[in-house]
């Protein structure tokens, strides 16, 4: 079972500093007028996990004209539990905050498993590792967990994207494998049938030749 537990947000869009539990024992209702940053909280979660927000945008620093004087960039930490293991994702953007390893956040992406850094080189490969641990791509996460104003629904996706989503949800890859095996068996049977037909034609010619000889 996958459970998101806690999120810490610094300098993300309109959020200056936020600590929020993600798995309380009760339902949380966040009420505020339009434009006051309700969806920004969820956007921070998505960005921390996938590197792009609810609308697919990766740039999430606070607007320069409204930044506080001590603004140090963006850092979002997300904790989640899967089985017996505890994970922590740290994603930074133009971040001057010094992290636990003694280095500045800058534009770093870090994944920890049971408080040990997952040693994968390169952001793309590390993102693949995060997706694998979650079992959810960005598209599937947005279509199955996140629903908000202005977000594309599954029904609006292209047929190819729908196919990819359904394959991810229902693990339909085995159908493609089975189709490949069936096609290979079919080709083998056709080859055998063609060989039998060829041998039959040769025998027929030989029989006709023998008849003429007698």
What positions do the PLM features span?
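A short, sequence-level motif marking secondary-structure junctions
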Residues: 92-97, 122-128
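Generic structural "secondary-structure junction" signal
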Residues: 14-17, 65-68, 136, 149, ...
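Alpha-helical structural motif
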Residues: 41, 72, 122-126, 137, ...
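Flexible, charged interface-and-hinge segments in very large macromolecular machines
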Residues: 78-82, 123-151
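Extended, Lys/Glu-rich alpha-helical coiled-coil stalks
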Residues: 29, 143-214
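Conserved, well-folded catalytic cores of nucleic-acid-processing
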Residues: 48-52, 133-136, 168-172
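Extreme N-terminal "head/tail" segments of very large remodeling/mechanoenzyme assemblies
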Residues: 1-117
